[in-house]
């Protein structure tokens, strides 16, 4: 069940152990231990900025995807409230987005929840109609974690900027980063959320890309670390582990992606030989999941409760 979490790469665990046991300094300290720790932060920023093709100063480290999502939505809503009070998202977002949007509704913000088509994708025309002069932020997930739908992110970003260049575009890429090539500047993305444990990195660490033109207000206060935007002593082992995992994944991305696509096709061919089975979320004229996430397949079995099937597979060492 690699959509829920992933096994940490041994190389990542080894690097983190070295930092925790040897290079354990506080990166804000001026002595040698602090300088050594700060080098790992620099390595992480350089690595992740290169992968995303962004500037190092545009990256903030968080405690995970949920905090990144909260910081993006609440921080931008607070910082841009004088421009408007309207937000847009979709009906199939992760709870980290949906629950945050519901909280913002209690604070006086209006939220539009876009429907999706039978394949789980938004319709750009719905987005166009939902946009108003009061829209300050749009948040759309890159990859749906249940059916593997890939949203038309680049097209949505272009549409948003065409209609109102000041409207911010946030993308929850927790399920997409490491499995797709994502370039925020090319795709008109202002804010991007990433999680370490979804890419064979550690739990408890995440990333938020914040474009340099974005006004955002901190939601965590303290010692002023990370440009006064996210206070707290940086989780150096976790941050370095996140960067190492991303570096490893993207160093052989094309081969891994091709292998996953082949596995997905083989799996779909196999389950279609069974009776009363439906593969969900397939695009028209794409019988083997083309145009959807290579690492996710959603299957329904008529007359079988999902929990019963889950435990039956669990007995065979298969976790879904």
Residue ranges and their predicted role:
Residues 2-320:
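Pyridoxal 5′-phosphate
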């Amino acid at each position: 069940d690699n959509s829920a979490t992933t096994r940490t790469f041994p190389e990542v665990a080894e690097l983190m152990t070295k930092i925790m046991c040897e290079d354990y300094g506080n990166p804000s300290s001026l002595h040698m231990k602090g300088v050594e720790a700060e080098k790992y932060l620099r390595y992480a920023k350089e690595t992740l900025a290169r992968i995303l093709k962004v500037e190092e100063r545009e990256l903030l480290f968080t405690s995970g995807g949920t905090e990144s999502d909260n910081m993006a939505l609440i921080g931008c809503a607070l910082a841009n409230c004088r421009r408007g009070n309207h937000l847009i998202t979709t009906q199939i977002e992760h709870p980290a987005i949906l629950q945050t949007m519901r909280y913002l509704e209690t604070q006086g913000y209006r939220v539009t929840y876009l429907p999706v088509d039978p394949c789980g994708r938004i319709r750009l025309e719905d987005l166009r109609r939902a946009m108003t002069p009061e829209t300050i932020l749009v948040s759309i997930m890159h990859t749906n974690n249940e059916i593997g739908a890939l949203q038309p992110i680049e097209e949505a970003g272009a549409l948003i900027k065409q209609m109102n260049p000041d409207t911010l575009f946030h993308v929850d890429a927790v399920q997409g980063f490491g499995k797709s090539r994502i370039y925020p500047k090319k795709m008109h993305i202002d804010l991007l959320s990433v999680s370490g444990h979804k890419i064979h990195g550690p739990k408890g660490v995440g990333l938020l890309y914040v474009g340099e033109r974005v006004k955002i207000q901190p939601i965590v206060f303290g010692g002023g670390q990370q440009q006064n935007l996210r206070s707290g002593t940086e989780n150096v082992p976790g941050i370095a582990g996140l960067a190492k995992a991303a570096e490893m994944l993207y160093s052989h991305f094309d081969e891994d992606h091709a292998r996953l696509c082949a596995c997905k096709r083989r799996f779909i061919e196999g389950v279609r030989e069974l009776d009363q089975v439906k593969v969900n979320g397939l695009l028209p004229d794409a019988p083997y999941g083309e145009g959807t996430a290579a690492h996710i397949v959603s299957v329904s079995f008529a007359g079988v409760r999902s929990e019963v099937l889950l435990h039956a597979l669990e007995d065979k060492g298969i976790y879904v």
